[in-house]
Amino acid sequence: MKSSFEFSNLCGTVYQQGNVQFGGNGDTLYSPVGNRLAVFDLVRNVSFAMPFETRKPIMRVAVSPKNSHLVLVADEDGHALLMNTARRSLLAHMSFKLPARDIQFSPDGRFLAVTHGTQVQVWRTPNVFVREFAPFVLHRTYVGHSDDVISITWSKNSRFFLSTSKDMTARLFSLDPVPGFRPKTFTGHRDAVLQAYFSLDERTIYTVSRDGACLTWSNKDSQELMQEESGDTDLGATEATNDPENYVAFARWGVMQRNYFHQANTQVVCAAFHAPTSRLVVGFTSGLFSLWDMPDFQSIHALSISQDKISSVAINESGEWLAFGAQRLGQLLVWEWASESYILKQQGHFFDMNTLAYAQDGQTVVTGGDDGKVKLWNTVSGFCTVTFSEHSAAISQVEFAKQGQVLFSASLDGTVRAYDLVRYRNFRTFTSPNPVQFVSLAVEPSGEVVCAGSADVFETYMWSVQTGKLLDILAGHEGPVTSLQFDPAGSGLLASTSWDRTVRLWEVFKRSGATEAMQLNAEGLALAYRPDGHEICVASLDGHLSFFDPQNGASRGVLDCRRDISGGRSVNDKVARRNNAAGAAFTSVCYSADGSCVLAGGNANYVCLYDVRERVLLKRWKLSKNLLLDGTQDRLDSRQVTDAGNVALINDLSDEDELTLAERQDRSLPGAQRGDLSKRSTRPLARAKCVRFSPTGQSWAAASTSGLLLYALDTGSTFDPTDLDMELTPQSVRSASLAGDALLALLGALRLSDPILLVEVYERVKYQEVPLIARQLPQLYVAEVLKLVASRLDPSSESPHVEFHLHWLSSLFNAHGEKIRELGHSSYAPVLRAAQMALNELRANIKTVCDENTAAMLYVYNGLTARHEQQIQDTL
């Protein structure tokens, strides 16, 4: 099995903090998700996360106006990354030394303005015509504010820019010295000035402050007074004054109008201005936003879209779509104000997600979190498709039925619920005679029986899905039943593990109800069945993975994994680094689709992949590099330790004036492990609560502190040739294919493992030769050809040769069906699932087209019939 899994996408979280930004023609939205950047394509309805991480959560996002794929992100410490979102490549690193409250590219794309405390720094951006050693070169530093600078706005000609500050003023600077010009100060606000904007003709300036005031500034004098105000009779100064490009520099700006938003008990948090339409949108702490027409200051639209404050707002290029981000609730919204409809409405889990499960098609993932929500995510688009909120407590485990569109969830509220994924409703609720907390769940392969293990009475409950009645109560464990799973082969065996250091096998469908107990060296935390049902893997508290034969209960081996999962340090660790592995353990295990590997994750920042046969570690992935999470650093910095404790645990009150009254109140209880972890005095632990392999074997997912992380095989960068020789080259393969030797060319392309060449040779095979080539194909390459056919059959490949691919599939099954059936649960399982998924999606697409065509033909037929009857009546 290949282990070259790379980061693919991040689901479960759509927005955390910072500013949202539109790119391109306004159909792309950039949103900071922790220390990663998420990209949402609003036209194609897909999203993905960049594979690069900053050191801390992203604070600002800036998009180049000359190339919307060039995006600069900066974290809380001022460390920035310049990346190309189209190629998903990292171009440059940069450190601004201080937190950047705002970053803006100039309209010509040649300069980058960055807030630097009370100063503004302007940097020259990389240029293909000028070779420089550093990617960014400091052009000039601008001073004048007495408090932190909040925002920057450029003029259209990139010669001037406005800056706003906490000192309740805005200032106008010139990029380069202009004869006779001195920086201008705009005063008159009573609170911090959040934003300042130029009008389209740059004859008017608008400033917005936190207290809800909007001031309109314009020129008070004529052109003659502007020249007198310059006070310089030098020829260069006169030419600069008469230059229309310098109008904003020599105008005598004064307050022409004072307007107020009149929102009681609220403050302005963010604002955005669209110059071509002169529309101003403002977000408030109450979750309300309002749209105003400037300079008349007429209210166009007002709507409450969130229960908490709106943290960021952006307007697309056409001015039709408004993007909002709500930090506390993790909401991301795109609103079309003209039609009053949502273009995008996404929200992640409010607290951590505890569990996940893959559907049989591999394209749907369900997650359950501490907020009591069950969410379904599409792995292709990255969007949440439906949310179930019937549970009133944290979700402990979710499972799909192997057959049918049914989803089960177990919760600490004492219920197990079944959901119909066709009608999206909760059609069955299972409860115990006495209220208990369910912490584990298992579904029988036929989907007719569901079992749940409790944490307080140490019993396992079994219900019938059809009737909803309790069938049996399995007693025997002496601790919380932490994990349950049925034999996937359908033998009826139920495996369970508990804190009582045992693994039990229950024959639940036999009258005897015999049980068999196998001893562990420590408390059992998780277990998994191999897909063929011939082996069980159990994770225990001592950091071991134990393997058992479920047929006779014999132990097949023990794997010590404590050193593999340890390594992360917490800021309040009191033990030495060499003793840090004592509490490391896996809390979730899962077999690969072919059963050759085990994926494990737990209370550490790593997910490990082990080879079952050799009992060795194949690969280890680090989930996050976010320094604000505990467990991401291998060594602690002694410079961060003070007499009052670690600096990271001390509340920073420097920005308390920007918080609302509700945010300043600390409602956390001493010793509480759950609750609002957005408080700055708490540090979440980087860990993986649940890991699962995709049924296709091409990807795996982890429910981590950062969200739902998806890792997939990078087929484009993986070169895995077999049986090479000097004569085997791409040119020789193409020559054989053009000469008509299809089998030789296909085998050569398979041995070279070149995906582009393989598709070219495969689709050049003649239709009538497919059955013959399928019969002559060696058994060694059948799985690879099936994988190729499944990938080309998938509608996402945009291949028009549907009948050709179906003919290949039928011929392979006719020629090698017996061997495929024999190995269907092991080596061929991922390929068969991929083919089934492609066929199901193809069938759904064809059915949709046929239904639409049938409805259209019925409409035409009914119209013709009515017209014919009307003609008959007119004749009579």
Language model features: what each stretch is:
Residues 766-876:
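Extended acidic/polar alpha-helical scaffold segments
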Residues 8-35, 56, 266:
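Beta-strand-rich domains and repeat architectures in extracellular enzymes and scaffolds
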Residues 20-26, 62-68, 103-109, 146, ...:
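Loop/turn segments within WD40 beta-propeller blades
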Residues 8, 47-49, 89-92, 131, ...:
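A structural motif specific to WD40 beta-propellers
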Residues 124-132, 174-178, 218-235, 550-556, ...:
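Short loop/turn segments immediately following beta-strands, especially the blade-tip
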Residues 32-33, 74-77, 114-118, 163-167, ...:
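Conserved strand-to-loop turn within each blade of WD40 beta-propeller repeats
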Residues 10-15, 52-58, 94-100, 142-149, ...:
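WD40/WD-repeat beta-propeller blade N-cap
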